[in-house]
UniProtKB/Swiss-Prot annotation:
It is found in: Plastid, Chloroplast. The lineage of its organism: Eukaryota, Sar, Stramenopiles, Ochrophyta, Bacillariophyta. Binds 23S rRNA. The keyword Translocase does not apply. The gene is rpl6. Belongs to the universal ribosomal protein uL6 family. Pfam families: Ribosomal_L6 (PF00347). It comes from the Eukaryota. It comes from Thalassiosira pseudonana (Marine diatom). GO terms for molecular function: rRNA binding; structural constituent of ribosome. One of its GO terms (biological process) is translation. This is Large ribosomal subunit protein uL6c. Keywords: Chloroplast, Plastid, Ribonucleoprotein, Ribosomal protein, RNA-binding, rRNA-binding.
């Protein structure tokens, strides 16, 4: 049995969980104060909700303990746990823009970045993601869905990944860039 997969998921009182199952798949819905998330799970996955004095918790297990099911048990437990954390607290990724003239702003439903190109870069902000710009160079990106948040942050960062010679680019908070020395001239 997976070490992570056998741990129970603690449910806060503000979270509502419901799941329906068909012949081939089951769907779990998680609702909280920041929104609701939905995910399809395989039919052989068992989800038990246990109520006790400390509150309620979920236990994720497979009926048939094959090698692949043991590894997938930890995966699905973590995915459901991320859904619970997302609807109660939200996930945050902070990006910083480093470079002369690099600026960001939010205009309506799009993020506008000035990254040294001849034109500003406009990126549409997906549904469920909020972007706040502080000091024109720091982006606070928040979302309930951790997967969607990571994909959007990677999409923004892909426009100007950090380069090792001058250290310019879009960086995650606390990211260290390995700096390289430039060419040394003939002596």
């Amino acid at each position: 049995m997976s070490r992570i997969g056998k741990l129970p998921i603690k449910l806060p009182t503000t979270v509502e969980i419901s799941h329906q199952s068909d012949a081939t798949v089951q769907v779990i819905n998680v609702k909280g104060k920041f929104g609701s998330l939905q995910r399809t799970l395989p039919e052989e996955l068992k989800i038990e909700q246990i109520h006790n004095d400390n509150g309620s918790s979920l236990i994720v297990s497979f009926e048939n303990q094959t090698r692949t099911n043991k590894s997938l048990q930890g995966l699905y437990r973590t995915l459901i746990n991320n859904m619970v954390i997302g609807v109660t607290e939200q996930f945050v990724i902070i990006l910083t823009l480093q470079g002369v003239g690099y600026r960001a702003s939010v205009q309506g439903k799009s993020l506008v970045l000035n990254l040294g190109y001849s034109h500003p870069v406009e990126i549409d902000i997906p549904e469920g993601i909020t972007v706040e710009v502080t000091q024109n160079t720091t982006l606070n990106i928040k979302a309930c869905d951790k997967e969607q948040l990571g994909l959007f942050a990677a999409k923004v960062r892909a426009w100007r990944p950090p380069e090792p010679y001058k250290g310019k680019g879009i960086l995650y908070k606390n990211e260290q860039i390995l700096r390289k020395a430039g060419k040394s001239g003939k002596k």
